[in-house]
Amino acid sequence: MGKKKRSTSKKKKTSTKKEEEEIKLEEIDKSKVSLKDAETLQAEMNLGMIGHVDHGKTTLTEALSGVWTDKYSEEIERGISIKLGYADAIIAKCKECPEPDCYWTKQMIKEEYQKDKRKKVKYDKCPTCGGDIEFLRKIAFVDAPGHEILMATMLSGASLMDGACLLVAADEKVPQPQTKEHLAALEIMGIEDIVIVQNKIDAREKEEVVENYKQIKEFIKGSTVKDAPIIPISAAFKVNLHELLMYIEKNIPTPERDLEKEDCRFYVARSFDVNKPGTEIDDLQGGVIGGTLSGGILRVGDEIEIKPGIRVDNKYIELNSTIQSISVGSKLVEAAGPG
């Protein structure tokens, strides 16, 4: 996320060693990164949560990250996602437990410890066996709305995704309208790293869940994701999340990033006006834009060009500005890499 305002500052041509170390994730020895330290890292992969309305995308995002992404009053009132939601999750692995029980997120570790109020949360120790926990990677969830009229919002989010979880509810016939449309959107975008999540298995009897599974298999037959794993879960009751994480780790890799790329492109998914009504002109702050960087490095002080810009007399005029601040999640940083 970059914040810009009117400025005459010159473009910075160099960065400090600290900045370079901060963003070159591939040069970090992950075996030495604690889960606490991982909070300061930039997410290295964007994972889309897609599927029909009310199939559990936001609930699953919260179960894995601890963040409920529906934050706007209308979303809360209507009980559906309207805008793209974002949340980071730190994925870790116990060195002692067998698969799939060895896979955790930081949030899952916290909640498992909190089941016993006598225990103190230890992010470096497995809450099940006490074995050492190792950091695997930090990912960002892009929670896309599933309602028909919000398809344009979902498509803007798809441009940010490196992979996706396609959620299909076990208590409804397959496929639902947006299940088909969201899968078609992924195929058009060329996103092939997909895990299919059969959610709400708690809402039906075993025989009905098995029949629903067969419907999913029939639905994806002949598609680009015909061989994608189908993982049955209950996001609401947090059942089978370890299994899901294992398949995410094995089927959705972190894409290769080019930090040296000169054509530095930032795809904008959302924007904010942080100015309060009645703010004097001299006190106006620039807009805030959120999205993902495809390659290269952005630094505070860099000059940027926003396209297509603003429309004047049926023509678009590009906007030029300077980056005043950069935040990754809630952390202010001096520079950011792809992701």
Residue ranges and their predicted role:
Residues 3-6, 13, 17-66, 137-141, ...:
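Helix-rich terminal scaffold detector
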Residues 28-30, 39, 218-339:
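Conserved catalytic-core segments of large NTP-driven translation/proteostasis enzymes
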Residues 65, 69, 73, 77, ...:
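Signal for well-folded cores of large energy- and translation-related assemblies
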Residues 16-152, 161:
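P-loop NTPase switch module centered on the Walker A-proximal segment
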Residues 52-53, 65, 147, 169-173, ...:
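Short, ordered loop/turn segments at secondary-structure junctions
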Residues 136-140, 144-150, 159-181, 187-210:
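Conserved Switch II/interswitch segment of TRAFAC-class P-loop GTPases
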Residues 54, 60, 79, 143, ...:
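Residue-level signature of catalytic and energy-coupling elements of molecular machines
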